[in-house]
Regions:
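Extended repeat-based interaction scaffolds and adjacent low-complexity, acidic/S/T/P-biased segments
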Residues: 206, 210-293
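Active-site-adjacent bridging/hinge elements
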Residues: 33-41, 95-107
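C-terminal, beta-rich DNA-binding module of retroviral/retroelements integrases
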Residues: 124-144, 156-157, 161
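C-terminal, helix-dominated tail/subdomain
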Residues: 52-73, 84, 103-125
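Extended, well-ordered alpha-helical scaffold segments
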Residues: 18-40, 75-91, 141-156
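Well-ordered alpha-helical scaffold segments within catalytic/enzyme domains
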Residues: 4-19, 60-75, 112, 126-138
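Low-complexity, glycine/alanine/valine/leucine- and proline-rich hydrophobic stretches
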Residues: 151-237
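Aromatic-lined, polymer-binding surfaces characteristic
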Residues: 1-65
Length: 293
């Protein structure tokens, strides 16, 4: 949201006269993406914490700012304005600044554990990509629009291209059921940032300190296997199938000698997880629920 589609919209706006065909193609991609990406935002302005580079914080809303910059009205301007304004208010209510007023490394509070190997003290300032909204002319309709709530969205929304099922609760929070996302180049805590069974806009997720004790491994929304004092979790999937009737199926192996078949099935008030474990030796399995916020 704050990378490929963001830069594509910059190109679409700046090059719409010189390269109209490509610019329109990028705008159309953004229209399609927006109709799915809106499911990542909760009613209070928070976005789903998922994946890497989370220390960029309110860059999460930069896509919507780029939509306005490129004049792509997927939803009414009041809806887009509401997404942006609520998002900023949510972030600025969190302890994300140090005593000098500088952005800290972390997510909703200072937290080095969630950071990437490529992060540095100035990394959080990628959040300022969202300030692209300040490039809108005074006559842009977004400034005149009245802030609106999110439109009525499906309580369950399927994203087959990313092997995700998005759930929207009546209180406005968002859950993503996931399987199959994997970063081949192994960023820090790739399993925790991409391969948990569920991610939630309120509860967030844990990153481990180590895998040698259960409290340090903290496998929230994961199935962990203990072997010789070490905990193993899902890092990647061998097979993934998404079926609207059966749910999200994955076959994975946390270590040699163990294979697991997992099915995630969404319901109106939550989801069900079913695991079939094939193990060549005795082991201890531990499953975690959502972490405390």
């Amino acid at each position: 949201g704050f990378a490929m589609h963001f830069y594509s919209l910059l190109y679409a706006k700046l090059m719409e006269k010189e390269d109209p065909e490509r610019s329109e193609k990028y705008k159309e991609r953004a229209r399609l993406f927006a109709k799915d990406f809106i499911y990542w935002f909760g009613a209070r302005g928070e976005a789903l914490p998922y994946g890497r580079s989370l220390t960029y914080r309110f860059a999460q809303v930069s896509f919507w700012c780029a939509l306005a910059f490129a004049n792509v009205e997927v939803f009414p301007w009041g809806v887009i304005k509401g997404i942006i304004n609520r998002h900023f208010r949510w972030w600025f209510s969190k302890p994300i600044f140090d005593s000098e007023g500088k952005l800290t490394l972390g997510y909703s509070y200072p937290n080095l554990t969630v950071c990437e190997g490529y992060n540095a003290p100035n990394s959080p300032y990628w959040a300022l990509k969202s300030f692209l909204i300040l490039a809108l002319p005074e006559t842009h309709p977004l400034w005149e629009a009245k802030e609106e709530e999110l439109p009525v969205l499906d309580s369950i929304h399927y994203l087959p291209h990313s092997w995700m099922i998005m759930q929207r609760e009546k209180d406005g929070y968002v859950t993503a059921l996931t399987s199959g996302q994997y970063a081949e180049w192994q960023p820090v805590h790739v399993a925790e940032k991409f391969e948990k069974f569920a991610y939630h806009s309120y509860f967030g997720f844990q990153s481990p300190r180590s895998y040698y004790t259960l409290p340090q491994a903290s496998p929230d929304n994961m199935l962990a296997f203990e072997r010789d004092g070490y905990y193993f979790v899902r890092r990647r999937c061998m097979e993934v199938l998404l079926d609207k009737e059966k749910g999200l199926y994955s076959r994975w192996s946390p270590m040699e000698g163990i294979q697991v078949e997992t099915t995630l099935k969404p319901y109106e008030k939550g989801h069900m997880r079913t695991h079939i474990i094939h193990a060549d030796f005795p082991c201890i399995a531990v499953e975690g629920g959502f972490s405390l916020p």
